[in-house]
């Protein structure tokens, strides 16, 4: 008999590529009050690629950019949007406005209004197709 593999194990075995073509990443938040890693540019609302805005901006690590087949130059000039697919349903559509440190695959959601305890620790991200309203 064959053993059944759940979705999370399948994503892990495929190198982090989900069945929807997205990439599994760690989901973190930045820019909230008392953020222990807040820097002066974030405090001013400045991202590496564009100004930061609530309900719009995210920061990606270089490894997440590479997994999505993006370069820093592409992000600077094209201002791509991503879809963050949350476990259990729901999608956040956000623009890449900043860089996140560290080497792991991670999306850092800009939350100046406060830390959002309802967001999960992991999500699947993909490039957004189509226009953004």
Give the ranges of each region predicted by the language model.
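Secreted/periplasmic proteins
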Residues: 17-133
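N-terminal secretory leader/proregion of peptide precursors and effectors
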Residues: 1-17
